[in-house]
Every structure is written in structure tokens, then in C-alpha cells.
Amino acid sequence: MSRGLGDVYKRQELMCELREKMGTAIMLITHDMGVVAETADDVLVLYAGKAVEYGSIEDIFERPKHPYTQGLLNSIPRLDEDVELLNTIEGTVPAPDAMPAGCRFAPRCPYGKDRCMKEKPGVYHAGNSLVSCFRYEGEKE
């Protein structure tokens, strides 16, 4: 293990120990889904500063609902596969002064519709998760 990875692992262990000892929560903001998988109980996924999905660590990793969450998890390289190119999410994050009127992910979304570009989605129940996506508008708890 390289020095840098060892330091990260030690800090991660320390955070978990402190959480247990003090009976507190930890808010961890990161793109490192490996750290999230090892540390978190619940996950709030943000895209361009907006919450798009909330659920347990199991639901987020095993049954992601929001297209951004799905794309994010699909972009993680697998250790059991040899690939030349990593999976990516098409497009780019909009500039802060050029956000779409509707869903911020709509221009990059494989399921995006005109409605998504024009209207902001509410928050809907999808299984045990909460998701901000019109695809789950009609689902029941």
C-alpha cells in the first residue's frame, strides 16, 4: 500500500471510531465512492448542487434510481474486468450561470424529455429511496 492510501485508510478508520464512540453522524462530501461504501450508512447524491437521490448505502449501490447515480456508479472501474476505456456520463456539468430551467441533469440524461428541461422534478418515493426524477412520479410508497 502506498503512503497516501495508507493515510486515507487510517483517517477513514479514525472517523468510524469517533462516530461509534461519540454516537454522532458524519457528513462526508466526496466523489470517492469506495470511501462512501466503507464509511456511510445513508447516502445523499448531489448533482450540480442539488439533491437527486437519497437512500441507504445498500439501495444506492445495489439499486440506484436516478440516472446520475446510475452513471456515477457505472463509471467506477471494476477490478475483475479489463477495459480500454472507462464508462463516462455524456456531456458536461452546466456552468452555475447556465443551469437548465428544469432538472439540472436533463441535458446529460439518457431518459431526458422536454418536460425535464422545463420543469423541476419533485421528490418521489422509489422503493426505499427518495429520488428527484419524473420517471418515479407515479410510484407508490
What does each of the following model-derived ranges do?
Residues 1-9:
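Single conserved hydrophobic/aromatic residue that forms the stacking wall/gate
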Residues 2, 27, 97-101:
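Short alpha-helix boundary/capping motifs
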Residues 10-84:
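P-loop NTP-binding/switch modules centered on Walker-like glycine-rich loops
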Residues 57-141:
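Short catalytic/signature loops enriched in Gly
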